[in-house]
Amino acid sequence: MIGVDTSVLVRYLVGTPLAQARKAAALVDGPEEIGLSPVALAECAHVLRTQYGVERGDILESLIALVQRENVRVLGLRTDVLLGVLVRARQLPGRPIPDALIVAASLAADALPLATFDRDQGRYGVVTREP
């Protein structure tokens, strides 16, 4: 397995600059298993939104498609749990991607309830409580 950072994900998803995008595509679309950090996914979502103006719904669709690839593993998370939370995020106002990743990590580690001051975290179907 080879780890992939945010810069590779962004180049793969936006297709520019062309030379780097082709290299990123060769890696992501290739046979080698790749590992994605949840932090890289969150950072990728942020870069796509702030630097490229991509809508959150489109970002979620791209991340869901990426995570569903046969050769992709999200480090420290179960794919089914992450996909479930990302799919749920599609239905939520604002589609908060970092919140979805926090919930997925807590679910994967069975670290529940989730301590938070953000009352909206419960919309992912997890038990929350204030600290």
At which residue positions do the language-model features occur?
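Acidic, PIN/NYN-like endoribonuclease modules and their adjacent C-terminal/linker elements
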Residues: 1, 103-131
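Short, well-structured N-terminal submotif of metal-dependent ribonuclease cores
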Residues: 1-36, 52-61, 119, 131
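Alpha-helix capping/helix-boundary segments
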Residues: 8, 40, 81, 101-102, ...
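Short, conserved active-site loops that position catalytic residues or coordinate cofactors/metal ions
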Residues: 38-46
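Active-site neighborhoods of divalent-metal-dependent phosphate/nucleic-acid chemistry enzymes
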Residues: 72-113
